[in-house]
Amino acid sequence: MPTINQLIKSERTVQKNQTKSPALDSCPQRRGVCTRVYTTTPKKPNSALRKVAKVRLSNGFEVISYIPGIGHNLQEHSVVLIRGGRVKDLPGVRYHIVRGVLDLQGVNGRLRARSKYGTKRPKK
């Protein structure tokens, strides 16, 4: 606890809360180009091959982002849209790629939660 003299000398500084997705620059989404598409393994209790992509954003940042859903058509130089949102068991992955926008197609045969995976309504 500071003394009164210490407070007179320099007043209290308000701590700014840091953003969890700095590469978005306060935007809801950002466009980028895939520089590498690969799989990686999650942290200790889990086991899988998670699909991720390294993306160079339009503002110059290079980030690792997660490709949600089953199957994808991404390759190097694909143009994608990035949103915030981390993957808890993949360290360093703080962004998601939006399905069904730009070069990334929606998930085929998806019937539930279609809007999250960019899938059109099936014909009856």
Swiss-Prot record:
It comes from Bdellovibrio bacteriovorus (strain ATCC 15356 / DSM 50701 / NCIMB 9529 / HD100). The gene is rpsL. With S4 and S5 plays an important role in translational accuracy. Interacts with and stabilizes bases of the 16S rRNA that are involved in tRNA selection in the A site and with the mRNA backbone. Located at the interface of the 30S and 50S subunits, it traverses the body of the 30S subunit contacting proteins on the other side and probably holding the rRNA structure together. The combined cluster of proteins S8, S12 and S17 appears to hold together the shoulder and platform of the 30S subunit. Part of the 30S ribosomal subunit. Contacts proteins S8 and S17. May interact with IF1 in the 30S initiation complex. GO terms for cellular component: small ribosomal subunit. The keyword tRNA-binding applies. The keyword Glycoprotein does not apply. SUPFAM superfamilies: Nucleic acid-binding proteins. Keywords: Methylation, Ribonucleoprotein, Ribosomal protein, RNA-binding, rRNA-binding, tRNA-binding. The modification 3-methylthioaspartic acid is found at residue 89. This is Small ribosomal subunit protein uS12. GO terms for molecular function: rRNA binding; structural constituent of ribosome; tRNA binding. Gene3D superfamilies: Nucleic acid-binding proteins. HAMAP family: Ribosomal_uS12_B.
